[in-house]
Amino acid sequence: MSTRIPLSNFLFSKNFKRILRKNDDLEFKIVKPKSNRTYYKLFKNYLKFRHSKGDMTDMSYLDFRTMLEISPVNTKILHLYKNNKFFGAMLYDVYEKSYSANYSFYNPIFKKRSLGTFLILKLIEEAKKEKIKYLYLGYYIKECKKMSYKINFKPIEILKNKKWESF
């Protein structure tokens, strides 16, 4: 089921505020996607750590570059830095009234920082500043732990029978 966050009603929970505080030493910048070997190396490290059995682990540099740079829509990357060193990123699409989070990757040695959630929270902050109405998070699959985190964002809506419903 597809999911989205209606941003006008979104409130940062205690846990989300804690994650933001825990990562307040990180800087972020939004840029147009441009691949390089540093990003690719971090991406491959992330895949090896988080998704070692997934289809993307065999992704070549050319495929990675295509994912980042070739899109029929306006795609951007939210970059994370610590002490001017690249730390992680979220690839997302920009539409008139919504953002769509596509893929995140980050340095896996910092898993206790909840960087996947942190990247979503930073994108929510940015979207709210830009008066964006929705953030689409992709599919929710209850049985898949790596995709079930999406219901932690409240309110959340799911697409059911071609209609968006609160979940």
Segments (PLM) and residue ranges:
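Residue-level preference for non-acidic, small/hydrophobic
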Residues: 43, 120-123, 150
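Active-site scaffold segments
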Residues: 93, 118-121, 138
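Glycine-rich phosphate/pyrophosphate-binding loops
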Residues: 98-102, 132-137
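Conserved acyl-CoA
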Residues: 121-133
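Conserved acetyl-CoA-binding loop-helix of GNAT-fold acetyltransferases
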Residues: 112-124
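A conserved beta-strand-loop-helix scaffold within acyl/acetyltransferase catalytic domains
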Residues: 3-112, 152-153
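Active-site/acyl-donor-binding loops of N-acyltransferases
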Residues: 1-10, 134-167
